Amino acid sequence: MWPCLTICLTLSLDCLRGTPEGSPETAPDLKELGINYTLKKSASPVPNRIHILRIELAPRKVEPAVVLGPDPDGDGPAEASLTDPREMASAPSVLAFINTNPWDSFPDAKGRKNRRWHSGQPVDIHGLAGTGGKMRSSGNPSNTSVWFDNEGRVRFGHQAGDEPVVATNGFQMIVSNGALTVGEGGVRHPRTAIGSDKKGKILWLVVVDGRQGGYSEGMNMHELASVMKSLGCWTATNMDGGGSSVMGLRDQDGTMKVVNSPSDRFLGRVKIRPLPMVLTIRDATDAQEQE
């Protein structure tokens, strides 16, 4: 067990860091839709702030959807242009979002990659990425994919013949069959993880803030896996982390806000890193009305 002080927020997130976005006419009741947000503060072995979304998929009141940045070159090598994640999650039906897949820039003529990320930058997405059954980025069969089937269940790892409806990809599986699959030790970073119960009907989205000494210093793989198992995850995967780790949630007033503290900074202020894609959780009824 990891010692922590648990703060179960009632989604009055005015004091948390974020940037307001467009609001629906009526703020959604997230708990009624099966979404619960918890912030856990851990003091040992280092200070950490752990943002947890528990989502009930079975009632089908909400649905996952991947939103990708624009494709800059059609059939060319780039699969998306980096975009502010809040922009990708700006539809009124979106209730929450997190970052998912690893990605990288393309080398120039001298083999150098520009990792000074900026909006509009063309990038290559690693692994499966798509929504509505259409994959923008494909990948070989792997246990690092996290996808949703046509019954709305979350699945981990894909094989030839699988038909993902919504798909993302991580770095490595950290919990399998209820047991940790990673050893102790390692470097601490900001982290994003996705996990589920044995039946794939309860989804956990987790972001751990990091690289902020004395406030939230991040986790290694073993610490992250321990968190996911303690939540009740039968399976969990480590997604892209570092400065990309971000979680957004719609507040009681209907405003979409970033609830975590991303590690990137510009002139001492939080800088939200542009991303190629996000996994959103949408109000299923609202989404159907908008289509």
Positions of PLM-derived features:
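Bacterial N-terminal signal peptides
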Residues: 3-14
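Gly/Ser/Thr/Pro-rich low-complexity, intrinsically disordered segments
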Residues: 13-291
